[in-house]
């Protein structure tokens, strides 16, 4: 899944319930949330049924492990990698005519050069074969 870039040998499970920064803020509950020995964060979501705006939801979820890396005082803003992994039991509408399972890895890209702009934020979606 990580093209040899990750070799997760030790995992520390983190609190899967993320509360907003205000009393009335929306919370998020991840299916699995863990950190590897390098401090990189992994969110794993298993979604059984199609949900409108699932991509938006996964982007929203990724903001929690980013924000929790902030440190008070003198901080240089260096972030650890964040991976949001969606194991889906549905196919995104744009993939509905595919006859094979779809593995999609998404990173921030410069639209002019088509080069990866930022490699520490990764979204991985695994979709089943269309029925």
Regions found by a protein language model. Give the residues of each.
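Elongated, amphipathic alpha-helical interaction scaffolds
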Residues: 1-131
């Amino acid at each position: 899944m990580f093209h040899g870039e990750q070799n997760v040998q030790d995992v520390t499970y983190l609190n899967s319930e993320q509360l907003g920064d205000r009393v009335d803020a929306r919370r998020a509950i991840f299916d699995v949330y863990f950190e590897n020995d390098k401090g990189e964060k992994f969110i794993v979501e298993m979604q059984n049924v199609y949900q409108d705006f699932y991509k938006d939801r996964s982007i929203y979820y990724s903001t929690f492990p980013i924000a929790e890396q902030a440190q008070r005082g003198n901080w240089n803003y260096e972030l650890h990698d964040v991976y949001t992994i969606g194991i889906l039991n549905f196919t995104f509408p744009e993939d509905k005519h595919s006859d094979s399972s779809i593995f999609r890895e998404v990173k921030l890209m410069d639209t002019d050069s088509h080069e990866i702009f930022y490699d520490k934020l990764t979204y991985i979606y695994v979709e089943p074969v269309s029925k």
